[in-house]
Amino acid sequence: MRFFALFIYRPVATILIAAAITLCGILGFRLLPVAPLPQVDFPVIMVSASLPGASPETMASSVATPLERSLGRIAGVNEMTSSSSLGSTRIILEFNFDRDINGAARDVQAAINAAQSLLPGGMPSRPTYRKANPSDAPIMILTLTSESWSQGKLYDFASTQLAQTIAQIDGVGDVDVGGSSLPAVRVGLNPQALFNQGVSLDEVREAIDSANVRRPQGAIEDSVHRWQIQTNDELKTAAEYQPLIIHYNNGAAVRLGDVASVTDSVQDVRNAGMTNAKPAILLMIRKLPEANIIQTVDGIRAKLPELRAMIPAAIDLQIAQDRSPTIRASLQEVEETLAISVALVILVVFLFLRSGRATLIPAVAVPVSLIGTFAAMYLCGFSLNNLSLMALTIATGFVVDDAIVVLENIARHLEAGMKPLQAALQGTREVGFTVISMSLSLVAVFLPLLLMGGLPGRLLREFAVTLSVAIGISLVVSLTLTPMMCGWMLKSSKPRTQPRKRGVGRLLVALQQGYGTSLKWVLNHTRLVGVVFLGTVALNIWLYIAIPKTFFPEQDTGVLMGGIQADQSISFQAMRGKLQDFMKIIRDDPAVNNVTGFTGGSRVNSGMMFITLKPRGERKETAQQVIDRLRVKLAKEPGARLFLMAVQDIRVGGRQANASYQYTLLSDSLAALREWEPKIRKALSALPQLADVNSDQQDNGAEMNLIYDRDTMSRLGIDVQAANSLLNNAFGQRQISTIYQPMNQYKVVMEVDPRYSQDISALEKMFVINSDGKAIPLSYFAQWRPANAPLSVNHQGLSAASTIAFNLPTGTSLSQATEAINRTMTQLGVPPTVRGSFSGTAQVFQQTMNSQLILIVAAIATVYIVLGILYESYVHPLTILSTLPSAGVGALLALELFNAPFSLIALIGIMLLIGIVKKNAIMMVDFALEAQRSGGLTPEQAIFQACLLRFRPIMMTTLAALFGALPLVLSGGDGSELRQPLGITIVGGLVMSQLLTLYTTPVVYLFFDRLRLRFSRKNSKPIVEI
């Protein structure tokens, strides 16, 4: 009591303390970063290696495997996957959450160095690594277009100057430049001209390499001067290479231009990028795993004026895609929802109390509690994101509850004629323990969340801590500022035998009288209520098992990502045509604002597209509805498929897949994997619970298999190395020399001119110069026949892997899809040599499913322990927790009614309900116990009186919590997919709980009281003195 008096009788000190909390909160709010969700990105590092011309199998065995063995020894690696394609290997390392990305990068570099001696010769550069997740959607895409500059020249400018500058911005992890490749001098050989001149391809290669050297020449000096020696030992342009003498035939010089076309071109002509209908160079910017997306985007935008100032006038630099506008719009929606919740809660208080002065007290307590929370959020390193702001929105109903309980009890004493300061002190003393019990038991609900590991634990930690801090500050404010304001602002009134009945007051009195009448009937029919209570418990179990489940609500971020998968034998020219066709279909959709895409590189039959939709206010359809509409149009394109998915703020795993969810097949036998993967994929494609089923296993690419006759080769004086070198020189886009320029290094690329390699007959024109100097056609010692070969070889760990990706049809939940996949795998009878498991988001969902019930039980157990300690009783906590089954039924029925699956957000709602609905029981039980102790009432009289006396605060607190959550249900616009499941769960649970617990709680209270008396009689024995 002295504690309360200290603040009630010292108003200046109390006001200043509240002002200090508010000022700290305002300062914290200004310093808090902004993000879509809490930081939950796994540390990911990507290792890249290249060997131009090498087959996928060669890359997997000679490059990927040595690197994987070395990288696999690094501590903290959670998952290692690799993909090897034509001339390229990419290894993705996903580390544990607690692994520092910079320390991991040092370990990766050390592992690369250790594996260097095991890698094949001829690699143009050492393997490199990047601290970015390639499966993440870019946070921003910039495009460069020009009417006068070539694509190669644009690419050079983008990669040499723009990408380097952008990469230095804080938060940027990777700048991937696509759409073309670096400039190069391309030597297109004419096989017939070479044969006529008796010049081998190796001879051409060696002549070019020898003519373009960069070596130090030294200096000459005398006693006075020093001269640096400089020679014209470098050739830099196609015009300089054309007159190069490569051979003498009967004393006549054979120049390079005689046997080849030499052009200024690009390193890899099999690359194409587009924005809308124009050829373009794309700069795809990804953030570091630990970086804040909004701060990073703001840093890039701040740099754009400087970038535009440095580019030539002939180049047009545009932002093709920016993730931040929808994130900002979503957060603005949450902030507006928070403001509406505060207003509705204050309105509820006013309608019940019918006093402007009384309403002003919680109207001050709520902002102080919420604003003060920002200071703690800043100190904890949190951000303003959808979850933390939703926590504050929900907290609105909680923080006002404490103030309402104190205010209502003080107002009751004032209505009885007590003086204001005395009423404030007496009223606060009576409900102080109740408020503390309510707050501590509510915070206890979130303790299991704080101890939860993995991605769900990281994701929910900010929500739990933010809400707990808001409740803690609210507790302090309600026991200090609220009673002080009541004592100094409210006035006592003369006791009335008949309360004034006006408006809401008349309705409340009528409700209270009706409740009293119905409660008497219920207390006389306790068995029927007991059956209802047990029915809600059983219904809870059935609903939880039956309701569809998912990991996280599908968001409409306004950004779509698409993966193109064409026939495995498609040419680059045909693939570029497919890209253009798909982009036209998408560009013509009324909901699309911008589309960019690229194809080429090591995987000729694949491409990527990034689609920006119009803002939510300018389109009627959701992102999923747009995808459904486009899927029908895109299916008409022959020879290729485009798989679309909405970009999400949470992306788990480092695999690049053409759909949102993945199921991975592993085997130590590549043959077994290749046998069973098509069967499994075909079976999964037939499931109605899955859509867009596709696989990264591509082993039907067209291959020309050359079979050497080694005996003939030996007789003709030809070795295998010379034959392989011939093929590499002719068809491998072989980089044979380096051109050094001040800003970059460029390559000289040699291959047979595409005019002479349009079909298989090009092999018949190839020849090798043997040891006697004779030209021997390839057909003399080799035979070839077409075959199928993999376009890529994938590993997970050190096992062969194939990932089947899939999306969900509209109306299907992830739990239904995973159950269907598991059932299909069992029915197929897949042998133990092929192992299947979910990966990425689907894997995290499976883990979350296994821990959900444990988490709910742990929360209930924690609340029970806290209540048991506070009440010094094993029984009373059970009475209080009896309110939970009805809330669970209401929440699950509401989700079913709105056709919303049970997600991680809905789980938060269930956890919140555990904390909310028990408040009603706490208020009843506290007053009943006090009435039994001090008033000498029977348990029946005590609980009946407690229910009637606490009816008004129970209605006020429940309606405050309900109206605090209602804006989440009704909210639309950006980010509503996250807010609505939380609001639906809470509103549904509160409505059902309010209808039932007003009757079940007193019945359960009496049941346990009678049980206690029965056991006490059995155990009572007379005390015998010895």
From Swiss-Prot:
Pfam families to which the protein is assigned, alphabetical: ACR_tran
GO molecular function: xenobiotic transmembrane transporter activity
SUPFAM superfamilies: Multidrug efflux transporter AcrB pore domain, PN1, PN2, PC1 and PC2 subdomains, Multidrug efflux transporter AcrB TolC docking domain, DN and DC subdomains, Multidrug efflux transporter AcrB transmembrane domain
Subcellular location: Cell inner membrane
Gene Ontology CC terms, in alphabetical order: plasma membrane
Entry's transmembrane regions: 15-35, 333-353, 360-380, 387-407, 431-451, 463-483, 528-548, 853-873, 897-917, 953-973, 984-1004
Membrane topology: Multi-pass membrane protein
Highest taxon of source: Bacteria
Keywords from the named record: Cell inner membrane, Cell membrane, Membrane, Transmembrane, Transmembrane helix, Transport
Gene3D superfamilies: Multidrug efflux transporter AcrB pore domain, Multidrug efflux transporter AcrB pore domain like, Multidrug efflux transporter AcrB TolC docking domain, DN and DC subdomains, Multidrug efflux transporter AcrB transmembrane domain
InterPro entries referenced in this protein's UniProt entry, alphabetically: AcrB_DN_DC_subdom, Acrflvin-R, Multidrug-R_MdtC
Subunit structure: Part of a tripartite efflux system composed of MdtA, MdtB and MdtC. MdtC forms a heteromultimer with MdtB.
Similarity comment: Belongs to the resistance-nodulation-cell division (RND) (TC 2.A.6) family. MdtC subfamily.
Protein name per the record: Multidrug resistance protein MdtC
Protein source organism: Salmonella agona (strain SL483)
Gene of this entry: mdtC
